[in-house]
């Protein structure tokens, strides 16, 4: 009888233990499922590998190292016992045993810091950190499969769940999380959102409510109705007025993509639009399910046209007239003007849309339009982001405008950008289009349609707001039609444009609705409508363009900060590509892309090929100027670093004028600077950066009158090969900067203006040769070694780049980056981190200066110290130098300016100075008479009177 209660207690305990075990197992399964679904993203994140280059920097491979003291390896590194010459494996700290690769991060550095024998080095792989095992794609010069997404789409991460790159800004604990911890952090955010659904899903408190909207504000500055279905309400410019509160969503927002978009959207207006769009789609109120097809053909029309050199030499009796729609942005007005000059003819029409964020270019465009009756600028503006729905809205509104201009009797619609250029003459283009005046020219993808839909994201729902394309979930392609797509550059005849712009039939109406929520809509909308419309038999699979696709360089997912997708961009043409314009296999009349700031020589070659050479002695043919800033723009458009450097440039230029132009006993050539810069230009000569041109006001001390001068500042050479030179010959050049463009392989921050809060990138250019490993060492102005890592250089590598994860702020002064092979110096380069004289565009305050100019706390640029390498590299830290740096950090006012100018003067040269108007200095040259000034003659880009043949060039 005693055993019975014991047995019952034992059974109850066993039952409880079993339940507890089941609960633990269930929780474990749930956690694993959550992580697997998070990792899958859209089902493809894990397969992204190193190709998912959403960030601009390549990720290093930093294996853990178990090595003895560095000094013990130096004899082997220099060729002694145990060393290995060259190097095919990734190494760290000189030669050692080959090690297994694992992805590196700041967390990897932290793990090595906890190692009993920590390595002071990390290891990188070469250019872009990704080598595909697929067969190399054969480059076809006549290929024109133009799509803005990678061909190897299945291997690319299109997830929008990955944490976004953050500047460190004194938050090393966040930046140093290993990838798994970052995923945990993101998962916690998404789980928290799930728990708060219904009260704070928009990222705000439960008491904040947004009033419901039936219609959102338009993107057009003039408030034009772009179409009932083109959804001009997208806030592409990012300037939409924020409402005072958020409204609780009208449905249960459960999709991870929508939740991710809500956590990242910045404005309340955008968050409400995301929630509203998601709910309408979830309730089946957004997307059409079935669309009518009106094409009488059963299959796809395959019309091809041939290039006949003889047929286009004769102008037809009734030549077509063309409406060029020029969609432009940025600040490269001289290049835009040169392109416009090349395509201009008095019989055609030019309608210019300038991005609403490009105010300078818009002002210049208005000035351009006032000179010619057949040039007009849209009265409305949109923010045409890459891949955005706003591009389609821009084209549709432009079409409606052109059709309503009864004084412009055009026959063809051609869209161009400032990066395009003609490769055949206007007469040839007109003769060709006159022969095929009933055709529409679009380039199709030419591959498997299901794969195109998948890689183009047509089966995904996107929304544009806050100048970003947010991915919100999946959707179905409407039934009843064939979906097509390819290039978003096309030539359309007037009849089809009228149909697209004004038709209210089921096809056009529903396609406008569908493509209002589509990524890269202009790459598919016109193709799909044409192929399913009564005009389907007019489609020619050729958009008459050559596009410079180099997907190995152009598909770096460089637009992930703009779209939740992985996109591609064409490369700029270079002189070695000129032969491609002379091909006669198929009719082509335009090419892209061209950037004068990258390479102007190819534009000059093409210009001479089409229109003949300029007269001998024509000035400015090899020069290029691009305005970076002018005083009509708000001062806040300049960074504190740029404003600081421009003021220093002005002071150094005036000192040069005083030393070279001033005569003892006279003050006629002595000046005092007045105010902020008036304008700033980049200056290039023969495609080499020559520096900045700063236009500024001064007071002449002799007559106390205001004058306007322009100063030319050129950077000094800072790359230096070791002396005596080593026998290592692969390194050609090294540079440090920011805004690395992996596609064109250059720094977009020309001049490398850096401040204490910038994150510099080190770049090396290599010649061909055997696989080798080199060591890169970063040294701050007081000889503190801030970072060191190895790079494995493959035999075919041309460029490597890496951004070391340094703690901020950087100590102001001249930094050095040393490159060693087998611990023998090969070369070094220097760069300036400028102390700031401005903070938030105001003179810097003492407490701000101390915070920014003293380096990171305890000079700890990383968790790990590299101090043991100082004696090995003969880099001695001088206490007096450290103390002087500490004193410099407290400088403000004139003392700070003097320190800054001494640093700038060591890395920049004041080349020349000139006056833009009257001056009291008798020996001061006039800017328009120099060869370098932005006021110098530039005939190649200047417009003029229309010539008797109707052209400008």
From Swiss-Prot:
Residues 48-62 have a biased composition (Low complexity). Its main location: Golgi. Keywords: Disulfide bond, Glycoprotein, Glycosyltransferase, Golgi apparatus, Membrane, Metal-binding, Signal-anchor, Transferase, Transmembrane, Transmembrane helix. This is Xylosyltransferase 1. GO terms for molecular function: metal ion binding; protein xylosyltransferase activity. The chain crosses the membrane at residues 18-38. Detected in brain, spleen, kidney and testis, and at low levels in skeletal muscle. UDP-alpha-D-xylose binds at residues 327, 355, 384-386, 488-489, 569, 592-593. Glycans are attached at residues 219, 415, 771. Residues 156-165 have a biased composition (Polar residues). InterPro entries: Glyco_trans_14, XYLT, XylT_C. One of its GO terms (biological process) is ossification involved in bone maturation. It catalyses: UDP-alpha-D-xylose + L-seryl-[protein] = 3-O-(beta-D-xylosyl)-L-seryl-[protein] + UDP + H(+). Residues 39-953 are lumenal. Monomer. Disulfide bonds join 251-279, 295-536, 555-568, 557-566, 669-921, 914-927. It comes from Mus musculus (Mouse). Its EC number is 2.4.2.26.
């Amino acid at each position: 009888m005693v055993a019975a209660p014991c047995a019952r207690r034992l059974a109850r305990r066993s039952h409880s233990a079993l339940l507890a075990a089941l609960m633990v197992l269930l929780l474990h399964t749930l956690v694993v499922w959550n992580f697997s679904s998070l990792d899958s993203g859209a089902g493809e994140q894990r397969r992204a590998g190193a190709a998912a280059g959403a960030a601009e920097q390549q990720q290093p491979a930093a294996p853990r190292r178990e090595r003895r003291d560095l000094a013990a390896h130096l004899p082997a590194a220099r060729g002694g016992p145990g060393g290995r010459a060259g190097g095919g494996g990734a190494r760290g700290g000189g030669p050692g045993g080959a090690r297994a690769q694992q992805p590196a991060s700041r967390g990897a550095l932290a793990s090595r810091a906890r190692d009993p024998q920590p390595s002071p080095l990390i290891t990188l792989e070469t250019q872009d950190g990704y080598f595909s095992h697929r067969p190399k794609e054969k480059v076809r010069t006549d290929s024109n499969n133009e799509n803005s997404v990678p061909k190897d789409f299945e291997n690319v991460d299109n997830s929008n769940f990955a944490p976004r790159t953050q500047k460190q800004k004194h938050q090393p604990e966040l930046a140093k999380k290993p990838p798994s911890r970052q995923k945990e952090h993101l998962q916690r955010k998404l789980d928290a959102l799930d728990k708060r659904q219904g009260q704070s899903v928009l990222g705000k408190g439960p008491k904040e409510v947004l009033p419901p909207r039936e219609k959102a504000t338009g993107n057009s500055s003039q408030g034009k109705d772009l179409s009932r279905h083109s959804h001009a309400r997208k806030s592409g410019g990012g300037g939409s007025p924020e409402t005072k509160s958020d409204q609780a969503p009208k449905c249960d927002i459960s999709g991870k993509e929508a939740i991710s978009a809500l956590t990242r959207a910045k404005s309340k207006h955008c968050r409400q639009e995301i929630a509203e769009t998601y709910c309408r789609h979830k309730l089946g109120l957004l997307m059409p399910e079935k669309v009518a097809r009106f094409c009488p053909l059963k299959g796809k029309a395959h019309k091809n046209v041939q290039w006949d050199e003889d047929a286009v030499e004769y102008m037809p009796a009734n030549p077509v007239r063309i409406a060029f729609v020029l969609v432009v942005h940025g600040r490269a007005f001289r290049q835009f003007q040169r392109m416009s000059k090349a395509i201009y003819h008095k019989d055609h029409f030019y309608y210019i849309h300038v991005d609403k964020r490009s105010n300078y270019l818009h002002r210049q465009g208005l000035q351009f339009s006032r000179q010619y009756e057949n040039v007009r600028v849209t009265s409305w503006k949109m923010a045409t982001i890459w891949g955005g729905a706003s591009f389609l809205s821009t084209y549709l509104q432009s079409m409606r405008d052109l059709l309503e201009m009864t004084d412009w009797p055009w026959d063809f619609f051609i869209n161009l950008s400032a990066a395009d250029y003609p490769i055949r003459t206007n007469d040839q283009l007109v003769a060709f289009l006159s022969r095929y005046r009933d055709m529409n020219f679009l380039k199709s993808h030419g591959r498997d349609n299901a794969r195109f839909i998948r890689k183009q994201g047509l089966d995904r729902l996107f929304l544009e707001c806050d100048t970003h394309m947010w991915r919100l979930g999946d959707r179905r392609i409407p039934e009843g039609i064939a979906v097509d797509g390819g290039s978003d550059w096309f030539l359309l005849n007037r009849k089809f444009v009228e149909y697209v712009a004004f038709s209210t039939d089921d096809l056009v109406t529903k396609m406008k609705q569908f493509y209002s929520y589509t990524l890269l809509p202009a790459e598919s909308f016109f193709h799909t409508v044409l192929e399913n419309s009564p005009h389907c038999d007019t489609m020619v699979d050729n958009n008459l363009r050559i596009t410079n696709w180099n997907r190995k360089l152009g598909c770096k997912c460089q637009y992930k900060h703009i779209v939740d997708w992985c996109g591609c961009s064409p490369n700029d043409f270079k002189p070695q590509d000129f032969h491609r314009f002379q091909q006669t296999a198929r009719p082509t009349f335009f090419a892209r892309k061209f950037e004068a700031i990258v390479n102007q020589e190819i534009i000059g070659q093409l210009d001479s090929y089409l229109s003949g050479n300029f007269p001998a002695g024509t000035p400015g043919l090899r020069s290029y100027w691009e305005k970076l800033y002018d005083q009509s723009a708000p001062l806040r458009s300049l960074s504190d670093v740029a404003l600081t450097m421009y003021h220093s440039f002005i002071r150094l230029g005036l000192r040069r004028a005083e030393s070279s132009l001033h005569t003892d006993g006279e003050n006629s050539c002595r000046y005092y600077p007045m105010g902020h810069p008036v304008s700033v230009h980049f200056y290039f000569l023969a495609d080499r950066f020559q520096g900045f041109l700063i236009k500024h006001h001064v007071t002449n001390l002799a007559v106390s009158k205001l004058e306007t001068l322009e100063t030319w500042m050129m950077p000094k050479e800072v790359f230096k090969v070791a002396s005596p030179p080593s026998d290592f010959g692969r390194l050609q050049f090294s540079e440090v900067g920011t805004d690395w463009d992996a596609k064109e392989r250059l720094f977009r921050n020309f001049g490398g203006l850096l401040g204490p809060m910038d994150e510099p990138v080190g770049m090396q250019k290599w010649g061909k040769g055997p696989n080798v490993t080199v060591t890169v060492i970063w040294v701050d102005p007081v000889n503190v070694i801030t970072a060191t890592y190895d790079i494995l250089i493959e035999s075919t590598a041309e460029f490597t780049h890496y951004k070391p994860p340094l703690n901020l702020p950087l100590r102001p002064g001249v930094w050095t980056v040393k490159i060693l092979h087998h611990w023998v110096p090969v070369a070094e380069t220097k760069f300036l981190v400028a102390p700031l004289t401005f903070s938030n565009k105001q003179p810097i305050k003492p407490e701000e200066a101390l915070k920014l100019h003293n380096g990171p706390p305890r000079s700890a640029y990383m968790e790990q110290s590299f101090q043991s390498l100082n004696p090995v590299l003969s880099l001695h830290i001088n206490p007096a130098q450290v103390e002087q740096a500490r004193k410099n950090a407290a400088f403000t006012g004139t003392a700070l300016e003097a320190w800054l100018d001494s640093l700038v003067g060591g890395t920049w040269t004041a080349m020349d100075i000139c006056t833009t108007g009257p001056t009291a200095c008798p020996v001061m040259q006039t800017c328009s008479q120099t060869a370098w000034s932005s006021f110098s003659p530039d005939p190649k880009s200047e417009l003029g009177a229309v010539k008797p043949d109707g052209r400008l060039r």
